[in-house]
Amino acid sequence: MSVVGIVAEYNPFHSGHEFLMNQARLIAGDDPIIAVMSGNYVQRGEMAILDKWSRARSAIEAGADLVFELPFSYAVQAADMFATGGVDLLTRLGAKNLVFGVEDANLNFEYFGDRISKIPRQRQEFADYSQTYSTQYNQMVAREIGHEVSEPNAILGLAYAVANANLGSPLKLSPVNRVGAGHDDILQREAVVQSASAIRNLLLNGAERSELEQWLPKGEIAAFDQEKVLPNWELLFPFLKYRLESASIKELQQIYQMSEGLEYKFKAEIHLAENFADFLRRVKSKRYTYSRLRRLSLYTLLNVTEADVLNSYDHVSTMLLAYSKRGRKYLKQQRKDFEIDIVSKVDRKNAQEGTLGLQVRVDRLFEQIVGADQNFGRRPLEVN
């Protein structure tokens, strides 16, 4: 069985994702496509613009057969941990092939991943405070493999390859050339495929839904029509300000990835910042990327500590969000062989455990923003 896996955020689901899904179907044939998707919080350190259930439905309608949630402990992380979580979950769920979009599908990702995975860990630790960690890491990669990997999707593809190599290469890697606008490009109205960032900006700036029809599926547009609030950092900024002003330095030092005195910088600059974008500019330095600072801001807002994240890895599970008829058949046949707990219903007991426990806790704030329960009382969506 040639089960194909995809790691995604679908923030939101757009025509570029649909293109990749079609490419995955060419590989899978009649076998299932499994998508492991970020939940209500995404890698760049912010709330998803649409809840996980709506995005999962769009993925099934576009051709996926099963959508599982990538736990918060992996989803809101730098590329290496994000990729590790995605590849590990897909492997445990029986996937044999990983399809992902990149700027140049001719690159030998399996070879690159194998080379980089063999680099001793101490050579991946950098002390140049005039550059970000990611810049120094990319420079090291270029030296090791003789090829500069700088495009955002290629960097993520390389992270998948390294994660796969570290796990013993359980998945065949199938990179696919992206089409349309780049990862963080500004709006290109003539493009058939628009970047998710540009689409989010359109939505947050009040674009007419008719303006989005060429880039978003009808089901996704209908979901946005039902939303009263689109989550974003400017909406959350007052809560972050309260959190930073009310917490002690000692409390902030317990926050996941709070290091090198950033707790003092955060606490000092929050008083002066007019909004979240201004706050990020004030705390930005050559040492940290904006994504790193957004993630740290999110951990702070949600009071996610180092202990919370480390303890969550003691019991890793994944929530089933949506499935097709083909997906249901696959689950029935293969579930007993999965090397991971599948959560179809959140209850008082499992809501206290591992990755699910942290996920349920952080979703509480998302629920307050959008006004809808995200875990308790929800069951996987069957989409035909």
Swiss-Prot record:
It catalyses: cytidine(34) in elongator tRNA(Met) + acetate + ATP = N(4)-acetylcytidine(34) in elongator tRNA(Met) + AMP + diphosphate. Belongs to the TmcAL family. HAMAP family: TmcAL. GO terms for cellular component: cytoplasm. ATP binds at residues 7-20, 101, 153, 178. One of its GO terms (molecular function) is ATP binding. It comes from Lactobacillus delbrueckii subsp. bulgaricus (strain ATCC BAA-365 / Lb-18). The keyword tRNA processing applies. Catalyzes the formation of N(4)-acetylcytidine (ac(4)C) at the wobble position of elongator tRNA(Met), using acetate and ATP as substrates. First activates an acetate ion to form acetyladenylate (Ac-AMP) and then transfers the acetyl group to tRNA to form ac(4)C34. Coiled coil: none annotated. GO terms for biological process: tRNA modification. It is an enzyme of class 6 (ligase). Its EC number is 6.3.4.-. NCBIfam families: PRK13670.1. The keyword Ligase applies. Keywords: ATP-binding, Cytoplasm, Ligase, Nucleotide-binding, RNA-binding, tRNA processing, tRNA-binding. The lineage of its organism: Bacteria, Bacillati, Bacillota, Bacilli, Lactobacillales. It is found in: Cytoplasm. This is tRNA(Met) cytidine acetate ligase. InterPro entries: Rossmann-like_a/b/a_fold, tRNA(Met)_cyd_acetate_ligase.
